[in-house]
């Protein structure tokens, strides 16, 4: 609304993140198997940082609404990919640390943290935006991502999976009701 676009465009910008997350999930798993979960988590967090940078550029380019909209779209796509890689990698990293015997516990932790972050993130994002604007919110996003990367880097890596890879379709077929 601030940029002069309709609610349709706002919804499209928001939904881009979720489409990107869904479409990049199979790649996140494949790369985690090849490179190891820690590298995938750091890559995903780097994507979160870059999404914040894209939002900052969108804020700075507010005099050009179409350019700002495209930068917001780019940021949402990058965030979706980053979320996919960070989420997939963190689950696999957790399983690598505690062992497959506790896989249910790791998945539960990941779910609690992920949904807790989404539940808190949306209202905190609105609060930040109302007080410090888009450029300030972008700075917060970049700072949080950078702190997360700095927390992840010193942690021990686990070995990449050596099992037979399954296609995304096969995995989906196993979990689909």
Residue ranges and their predicted role:
Residues 75-114:
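Cytoplasmic helix-loop-helix junction between adjacent transmembrane helices
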Residues 156-177:
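Juxtamembrane intracellular "pre-TM" segments in multi-pass secondary transporters
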